[in-house]
Amino acid sequence: MGKLLSLIMKIFFIVLAIFLIYCATIGREFGIKQVHKIMGMYYVHVGDEAYQRNDMQEAVDAYQNGLKLFPEHYEAWLNLGNIYVAYEDYYSAAQAYQNAILAKENYTLARMNLGIITAEKLGDFDAAIAEYQSIIDSKQFLLSIPFVFDNKKSAKDNKAIAYYNMGRAYSQKAFYLPQNKKKEKKELLGQAAVAYGKAHEITKNDYDINYNLALTYHLLGDYRKAGQYYCKAIEASPMHYEAHYNLGLMLKHLNQPKYAIDELEKAAVLSSGKYSTHSKYIFDVLSSVTLEFQQKGEDKSIRDKIKINEPDTQEQPLILVNGKVTATDEAEVAIVENFRKCMSKELFEVN
């Protein structure tokens, strides 16, 4: 069936090209342009087939041939950019995405991909932020026909993703600043928190959004908000160990060993068997907190320890990977629900 369809498409393009060549005698310039367009679309079709077969080199050759003839084909530019990313040719990928945007200004996928590789791979955070802002500011035609078509949700989701990626870009820019640029770092982290907050307004139960909001407030020294969002992240996806671990570290710093032990124990269980180095470090931290707790035999009120919007003077180790354990049977549901409980949540609630 696939071969028959491919043959029909080839015949269609050949017949159409012959017809357009014939028409070129009436309007030569227009006719030549249309011939190039049709032949370009044919090469793009060949590229699409190769792309689906995962034959990337043939796809690249076909797309390049097609785009020489029909450079306005924005989807071909997008696919070509994606292939360059797979080959880790990020500069060529960026150029392909830029060409896609030239062909279609409000092409959200191309802008999003361009922003991601510009920030994550090329280190141009300002350019990435500009792309995300363009997505946020874009005025797209929204249409909702029940049970037929609805692009309102996708447009809303894209804005949430753009805000989230913008937050990451601000955070990364802050991370790469020299240590003596404390004021600038704080300002950038503040901008990251605003961007993550905008994403959270759209998508409240996303683990990554809540976790990065928590982490940003943690770095800013706003422990109350950090605790609130760590708990939200844990409730959204309890089997990721990072939120448990970072919350445990923060509670240790706030002299709340009982709650710190609870979170660090969960982090240790979730990281065991997957990240041996991380697991050992978590167990070491857990052991030290447990020992301190046993020696003191008490924990002080956290409400006297939390300071809002004051940077933390002590550097704290942070693990930033996407490890998780997934429950697979009914017996583990209870375990998941136990991990979902953020025992220190009430400590961060505003009176």
Per-region residue spans from a language model:
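Position-specific recognition of the canonical hydrophobic site in helix A of tetratricopeptide repeat
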Residues: 44, 51, 78, 85, ...
